[in-house]
Amino acid sequence: RIVEEDIQKFAAGKEQFRALILAPNTNIIADWKERIDKDLQPLQNRIDIKTYSYAVRHYHEKTRDYYSYIVVDEAHHAVAPMLKRVIQYYAPEFLVGLTATDQRPDKKRLEEIFGNYTTELSLKDAMEKGVVARANVYRIKTNIDLSHVRFNGKDYVNADLEKSVRVTSRNELIVNVLKDYFTEGDAGKRQGIIFCINKAHTKEMARLLNAADISAQDYSGDTKHPEKVMQEFKEHKIRFLCACDMISEGWDYPELGILVMARPTLSKVLYLQQIGRGLRRTSIKKNVFVIDVVDEYGAMVRP
């Protein structure tokens, strides 16, 4: 609600107030529309919410000073050439960049777009101040050796990971932990995401969970009717989504209570994006359980 409150204060008494909210995909756009409808309904007609791709195609249709307030969600994308052109075309009174992952893989800095940070809040500080849910992290160790898995400069090579990590014993270990420690009491009521390596891994994890009487569904680019699957998840008909690629960035479901990090990564950006999916705090959710699957990394370091 920080942005909504700031927009409300900024717009007070300004008849010419107009705001633009930019986001990378339609899922995040839908979330913003819901938030604006709920919290800023009187200003709804003066706030445009657009995807990056739409803005790239149409930004020149507005004058440079048309918007007085611009929000760039998932702002670590802002240094991409086309999006950067859009942002620098406009001359708002106030420009806000929102990101939990200001460290980009290509090392480009967001100060190029937004200037020096006015406010910077570490994840640890945010948890201590109650801005986000506290993460209760549990590490489960495997005997899988990743020391021979190649590194492409940003992260592990997926083809190598598949050979090393798609091991039945490792998958069963994850299922057993969920069955032994997360099926009773408050923990047993929580829904979760299992971050997998690839599409085949999502299917294997879902099959094993269902066999253990824990309702699960694979969720990837191969999923038929993904909107229906997501709706069933939000209606609590599915307890775990076994996902790859589709919900690392921007996806929001405040009730999410368990994150299983089943995909090894050396990317701090990806790791924080995945952790961030469960950090939305609600009136009844104060913490999120993070199950970190720790393999043998050899000389490599974890994010």
Where are these regions (language model features)?
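Conserved Walker A/P-loop ATP-binding site and its immediately adjacent core
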Residues: 2, 6, 15-36, 197-200
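Inter-Walker segment of RecA-like/P-loop motor cores
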Residues: 27-66
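Post-DEXD/H (motif II) to motif III coupling segment of the RecA-like Helicase ATP-binding lobe
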Residues: 77-137
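Conserved helicase ATPase core of P-loop NTP-dependent helicases/translocases
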Residues: 203-204, 214-245
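Conserved segment of the helicase C-terminal RecA-like domain
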Residues: 270, 277-303
